[in-house]
Structure formats: structure tokens, C-alpha cells
Amino acid sequence: VLGLKENLAGSVAYTAEEVKNVTWLKARGYTASIMDNNPYNYAVQKSDKVTVKELMPRLGEYDYLAIEWGYREFPASKNAYMDREALWKTFQGYSAGYMFPVSQGIEVRAGDLSSEPLKTLGYALNN
């Protein structure tokens, strides 16, 4: 959909505590990319008082950036170079991890859910 590719790095953008925090989840969801392919948030505990909505995947921060990068138009620009410069200015404040995701490597795995996989797994086992 919209050209989004698998992004297993989406979940490692957030810590184990962030993926359990109801305020964080309402604002950002539990992964930076829906293309991380994590079916639900298994780290949340009953005591976290998270609703079902926050347990389900949704578009994340990376997804919005990728869609804007691929589809944004610059009506005032005169050439592709000006478009590229405008895009770089737009994304200056974002982490390089959002700009160039890694989908393979020791840092990322399918189903890892956070940057702290052992801590997150501990939460899951408590459920």
C-alpha cells in the first residue's frame, strides 16, 4: 500500500516502557511503522490501563514520513534539486532511523516490539 516496504526497525525506535505507557500509545502507537508487522502490543500489563485501541497496530511516525517523502508536491519548485532540498529541510529534526530504516541485522527482528526485547518479553510472560 502506497509503496511502504517492510520496516522491522519500526519497533526498536521505542523502549519497553514507552510501548506500555498509555499516554505514549495514544500519541504514537507502539511501533514507528505499521510495516514492522507486529500484530498487537503484547507488553502491556493489566495495570497499565490501556484500551484495546492502543493494542492494535496503526500507521506510525516513520510511515507518515515515508508517505510524505514519496508523495509530497512542491508547487513553487522549479526542478527536482529544489524538491530534494525542501524535503531535507522538512525532515531535519527527525532521527536518522526514521529516514533510513534497517530491516535486517542484529538490532532488528520480527516481533521484537521494542529496543529492549528481553525486558519486553518479560512483560509478555507476566501476562
Give the ranges of each region predicted by the language model.
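Catalytic Zn2+-binding segment of zinc metalloproteases
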Residues: V1-A13
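Conserved catalytic/binding loops enriched for acidic/polar residues
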Residues: S11-N127
